[in-house]
């Protein structure tokens, strides 16, 4: 589903559901891939960073957490920038920031400097690309929006399949510094995607005249009215709890395998398996959600996806060998893909198109706090116990709790709300028949009108002059 991005085009623009929208979808696919896969892909460098700086699991986990926190927490800033400058310029600047952060990180001499470069600068750059790309996608698609969101969300697993082995390969050949430098160059592709975000323009009236219509009020940079929506509040609370555990398994599964004695390349392949399954899960979930009979119940489908994900984490905690982790990654990829494809589609279904830009930024801001807590808390638990099982149990419990909050909240607070009395279908049909019935032809006799006009004044003793007698 921050500060309200009110970067809306002129009134009367209909979403094309195709055309240049496919180019926008491709750009959103790339941006989503970098935004979500990058925080997980950098985890392949964690072991070498621990040896380089003499730090623990929780210290390296902060890199992914800060990246995700910037991606989520800068929602209001992205909103105001887009409202002021538009989607395309903001994304161009964001692409430069994302690249600059990784290039600068390759020269860092302490973990704090990596937090500032990879975490803050690159994270800000990805945020300035991610939110505007989603806004543009939802402007170009309406009827096909669930499918478009599912296809765009598939960018995350596709890039995860590519970036994780690539990161391991770069680390083996060039070390973590050379790997960061090359990844910084790859992030410049965000600028290419920004160029695809062509704004929608209202069609001109015949003769080149500007279309006449009501003037829109000046947009607000921060629209907090969405907090009066009960459905939005339930979604925001559930999503914040979900994020506490959602990103923990992908961050730790590679280290989990290495701790079992699995070779580094084979361990990194787990993320490729997860991503490969995720590639098919997201478009499939988007297609199913777009079905007429399913779309009204998308909130409950999203709740099921969260429950499935949390249950997978709990069962994954029992894995004792590489085969068990492979099975875990397969089912985690399915559930994770469902969550990724549905989260923003459900948010739009709850708040509507007009308030989506406000709602998404505010939700991302709320989730930022949870992102800062999730992976580091898992790292702290791992440092204290040295047992990966407890990390996966904690993550699963958090995601399961979020699914119950969303399900029960919508069922009891939304679905059970007292609805106004509905008129019977027969009465509705009768009323419509009366409304569409042609009026009775009432004829007026001019002589009766003349007689009435003469009679009224005579009652008061007045003299009446008709047009004929006045000549």
Swiss-Prot record:
User: Matching InterPro entries, A to Z?
Assistant: MCT, MFS, MFS_dom, MFS_trans_sf, Proton-linked_MCT
Gene Ontology annotations for the cellular component aspect, listed alphabetically? apical plasma membrane; basolateral plasma membrane; lateral plasma membrane; nuclear membrane; plasma membrane
Where do the segments described as Basolateral sorting signal lie?
A: 429-447, 447-471
* The protein's name in its UniProt record: Monocarboxylate transporter 4
Supply the PROSITE patterns for this chain.
Answer: MFS
Asked whether the keyword Disulfide bond is assigned, the reply is no
Q: What is its main location?
A: membrane
Phosphothreonine PTM positions read 466
User: Which positions does the record annotate as the modified residue Phosphoserine?
Assistant: 430, 470
TM regions (residue ranges): 18-38, 62-82, 85-105, 110-130, 150-170, 180-200, 232-252, 268-288, 299-319, 322-342, 356-376, 392-412
Q: Which domain of life is it from?
A: Eukaryota
The gene designation is Slc16a3
